[in-house]
Regions:
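Bacterial N-terminal signal peptides
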Residues: 9-20
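Extracytoplasmic copper-binding redox domains, predominantly the cupredoxin/blue-copper superfamily
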Residues: 23-227
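Bacterial N-terminal signal peptides that target proteins for export
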Residues: 1-11
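A detector of low-complexity, intrinsically disordered, Ser/Thr/Gly/Pro/Ala-rich segments
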Residues: 4-5, 18, 27
Length: 227
């Protein structure tokens, strides 16, 4: 290795170490009030660090999937940074018609068969409720986030946000039952901050949904007669 290259490495190494040391983590605990006003772990709650610029940088490499499988969407909750593209493969041996009437992103991917896939890009942060125009039991939620550091709470309601720059960090959360949360955390360099989030999901009810035409779904029938 040349002396010049060695000097460059010598200059860059302290910088890399300093940047690594400056990052910390946020340990999040989420609880949600259920219909009986009991606090239960917020399993599946999406939490993230707000950083729109980082979201834009991460978007080109973000291509999560929401698959149609066994007349269900898998996963039920997915996450993508704003500007990212989501894949919607059909893994069933029947047709599906993925659509959304959400204000954040209205779209209709049309009918497509087994083995085919469609894609959709999402620009506006917020939850997007996704359905199938043929099968009313199919429902998913895509959470479009304005950040690049995110996690979903486990069955115990805990999540860890890692590699967070030291200093003040704005954290947001979204839960299907309990709605939204925004808070500010002071992240220590090389250390961990704790954040407890309490959400009220006591009023949550699955009210069902209409088809893409805003009408009730027809009675269930054999899939072969649907199209």
């Amino acid at each position: 290795m040349s002396a010049l290259r060695s000097a460059r490495y010598a200059l860059l190494l302290p910088l890399a170490v300093a940047l690594t040391a400056a990052a910390g983590e946020i340990r999040v605990t989420v609880s949600v009030l259920d219909a009986e006003k009991n606090a239960v772990p917020g399993a599946g709650t999406v939490v993230w660090v707000v950083d729109p610029a980082a979201a834009r940088r991460a978007a080109p490499g973000a291509r999560p999937k929401i698959a149609s499988k066994d007349k269900r969407f898998d996963p039920h909750v997915a996450v993508v940074p704003m500007g990212g593209t989501v894949q919607f493969p059909n893994l069933d041996r029947i047709y599906h018609n993925v659509f959304s009437l959400s204000e954040k992103a209205r779209f209709d991917l049309g009918l497509y068969r087994n083995g085919a896939s469609r894609t959709m890009s999402f620009e506006t942060p917020g939850p997007v409720r996704i359905y199938c125009n043929i099968h009313p039991q199919m429902a998913a939620i895509l959470v479009v986030i304005d950040g690049a550091i995110w996690a979903q709470a486990g069955s115990d309601g805990t999540a860890v946000l890692g590699d967070v720059p030291a200093g003040k960090a704005t954290v947001r959360a979204w839960d299907e039952r309990g709605g939204e949360f925004t808070g500010v955390v002071d992240v220590p360099a090389g250390g961990a901050a704790s954040l407890a989030i309490s959400l009220d999901g006591s009023a949550f009810r699955d009210a069902g949904h209409k088809n893409k035409y805003g009408k009730d779904y027809p009675p269930p029938d054999d899939d072969g007669n649907q199209y």
